[in-house]
Amino acid sequence: ILRIFHTELEAVYEEKNRSLDSDGSKVFEALFSELFKNHNYGQQTTIGTVEHLKNPSLVEIRKYFNNYYVPNNMGVILSGDFDPDMVIAQVDKAFSYMKNKPVAKYTFKPETPISAPVVKQITGPDAENLTMGFRLPGNKDKDVLIADLVRQVLTNGKAGLMDLNLVKKQKLLRASAETFTLIDY
């Protein structure tokens, strides 16, 4: 697998470069870095840092693979028109070499409450926009359902408060409210 690593790394590097040129990606990264100072959500993007990509450690990559790419830490999702018995047999055969092993639970220092507004400015070629973020509880918390209901009242593409009062009255080109909840926050 590692023999094709460098060609894959080039593709990942190109994806990282695209994100560095994207105002939206820069805004999202800045938002998460401010909301999650302790959690990995705000420490780096999924694709990693430029430094990680410049100096990859094959030893660390192999270690990560061996620790986390285990059957009890993954799922196989299939869709389409196929014979389930045949496909399950193929999946079983393809992954039969893998053995279950304990996977350490992710731990992190809880975030401190946000006590004052945080303002970050991102510069780039895109049109000006405002992004506001709020740290919510994890996706298993019932308050997240309330946050999603508020989102739908604000914007739903047709008759949300922001849709009617800002977009349809042409006060703004676009306005949206989104809930982006993850496991821990």
How would you describe each model-predicted region?
Residues A89-A94:
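Short amphipathic alpha-helices in soluble, non-transmembrane regions
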